[in-house]
Every structure is written in structure tokens, then in C-alpha cells.
């Protein structure tokens, strides 16, 4: 059984027991939250698509921790002009465990 869930403008394919990195949610570690924005649900080769969400479907998650990803560096150099730009970016994320998918 798996589900497609919407969180922070992105879509994630999740199964029970998975550990997923969502965008920062500002929640306490060990807290449990229910997500109601389930776009699709598949169990026993039976696919249920929502319009836009599946009615009555919930996903229970447990927050593990909040962290920051490794730095992604972008570097641009223009040849023969002594011009260059270097920027770094670190994404904030929340690591969660999928406890239960209920339909």
C-alpha cells in the first residue's frame, strides 16, 4: 500500500514505515501529525485518485528531527572578464516517519 501526499507544494510517494524528508514544518521532535492532503492511494493494485484529494484518507506521521542539508554551491565564471559569482544554499528540512496510512 502506498500513497501520494502533497506537502509544501511538492508531492511525495510514501509507504508505511518510510522515512521522508519534507520541507521545514516547524514541529517538535516526537510529535505526531495527520496529513489530509492525499492525492492518490493504492492498495492491493486498486488505485484511488482524488479530485483533488481522496476523501477520508489520512496519513499519520511522527517527526524525527529538523535539520539542514549539505551546502549546494553554484559558481559562475565569465571568461576573460575577471568576473565570477559564488553562492551557497542550505535547505531546511524535517525528517518524518510514516506511521499509518488510513483510507
From Swiss-Prot:
Family: Belongs to the bacterial ribosomal protein bL21 family.
Function, as annotated: This protein binds to 23S rRNA in the presence of protein L20.
Molecular function as annotated in GO: rRNA binding; structural constituent of ribosome
Protein name per UniProt: Large ribosomal subunit protein bL21
Domain of life according to the entry: Bacteria
Organism: Wolinella succinogenes (strain ATCC 29543 / DSM 1740 / CCUG 13145 / JCM 31913 / LMG 7466 / NCTC 11488 / FDC 602W)
Subunit organization: Part of the 50S ribosomal subunit. Contacts protein L20.
PROSITE patterns associated with the record: RIBOSOMAL_L21
HAMAP family, A to Z: Ribosomal_bL21
Keywords annotated in UniProt: Ribonucleoprotein, Ribosomal protein, RNA-binding, rRNA-binding
GO biological process, one term: translation
GO cellular component entries: cytoplasm; ribonucleoprotein complex; ribosome
Pfam families associated with the record: Ribosomal_L21p
Amino acid at each position: 500500500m502506498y500513497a501520494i501526499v502533497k506537502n509544501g507544494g511538492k508531492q511525495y510517494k510514501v509507504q508505511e514505515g518510510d522515512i521522508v524528508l519534507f520541507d521545514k514544518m516547524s514541529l517538535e521532535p516526537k510529535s505526531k501529525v495527520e496529513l489530509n492532503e492525499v492525492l492518490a492511494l493504492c492498495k492491493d493494485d486498486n488505485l484511488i485518485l482524488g479530485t483533488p484529494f481522496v476523501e477520508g484518507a489520512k496519513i499519520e506521521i511522527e517527526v524525527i528531527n529538523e535539520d539542514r542539508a549539505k551546502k549546494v554551491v553554484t559558481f559562475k565564471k565569465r571568461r576573460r572578464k575577471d568576473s565570477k559569482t559564488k553562492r551557497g544554499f542550505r535547505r531546511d528540512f524535517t525528517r518524518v516517519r510514516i506511521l499509518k496510512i488510513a483510507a
